[in-house]
Regions:
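His/Asp/Glu-enriched, well-ordered alpha-helical/loop segment
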Residues: 43-53, 60-84, 89, 94-98, ...
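Glycine-centered flexibility motif
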Residues: 6-9, 25-29, 58, 126, ...
């Protein structure tokens, strides 16, 4: 994993335009490494058949990373056995969404980040830019590969919180805001679960072994006390693990 920028709340995520509440003239964050340095790293990996995962949060960093992935694809073709991934990618340029699909780049998000800083996106980025943050439903409509995670220890390592926030766009503790933040980007439970399981396995390049229950796969699974696909989303966090299996072997039972 490579880091290409910081975070919006500290004005270290790299933007194409300055922050709405600039701390100094031209405040638009910065890349953590020069773009040419990242380009050399990604191209060297692509030449050897390897893929790269890059931390990008601001639209400037996302756009620059996609430019590099695009050049790598032109030179060496799209990766065949693993998948380039952008991690977090919170604030995108609208035109870069379709580039994710074109380049088969995984959009790896942490749903609990949505409400980590209430009011922060509007404060730092303004209403227009904040309307295209964590666009899970749009990704699904456009055919973008998605992966979900917790980003522990930044947020708790609690799987049901991930699913709850992806489905409701509400904070897992306060349940704010009513109706969800950007409710048009809510997704159904089946999509959220798929992103969290098979999507994450795909991002890791191990979807042939992990992420779903199919003949020949590892049979890593949990048994829950209620069905996350049918339970009321507001009751989802009460779900308890009854058993855990690793490679088909029982390793935990309540």
């Amino acid at each position: 994993k490579q880091f290409f920028d910081g975070v919006s709340s500290e004005h270290t995520a790299y933007l194409t335009e300055p922050y709405t509440n600039p701390r100094f003239p031209g405040d638009q964050g910065r890349l953590t490494v020069p773009a040419e340095r990242m380009r050399k790293l990604v191209l060297a990996a692509a030449e050897r058949g390897h893929t790269v995962r890059i931390h990008v949060i601001g639209d400037g960093a996302i756009h620059a990373a996609l430019d590099i992935f695009e050049e790598a694809a032109e030179l060496y073709g799209l990766p065949q056995h693993c998948h380039n991934t952008l991690e977090h990618l919170e604030n995108l340029l609208p035109e870069d969404i379709d580039r994710l699909r074109k380049l088969n780049v995984v959009a790896s998000s942490q749903p609990c980040h949505i409400t980590l800083d209430p009011g922060g996106p509007e404060r730092d980025l303004g209403l227009e830019r904040s309307r295209i943050m964590w666009p899970f439903a749009t990704y699904k409509q456009r055919g973008i590969r998605q992966a979900f995670g917790t980003d522990s220890p930044i947020t708790p390592v609690t799987s049901m919180n991930v699913l709850y926030t992806a489905i409701t766009r509400q904070d897992p503790k306060s349940h704010w805001p009513e109706g969800g933040w950007l409710p048009s980007e809510r997704i159904d439970a089946a999509t959220a679960l798929r992103n969290y399981t098979l999507g994450s396995a795909y991002a890791a390049g191990d979807e042939q072994n992990l992420g779903s229950l199919e003949p020949g796969k590892y049979a890593d699974l949990v048994v829950l006390d209620q069905n996350p696909l049918t339970v009321d989303p507001q009751e989802l966090q009460a779900t308890k693990v009854q058993a855990t299996y690793l490679a088909g072997n029982l390793i935990y039972e309540r």
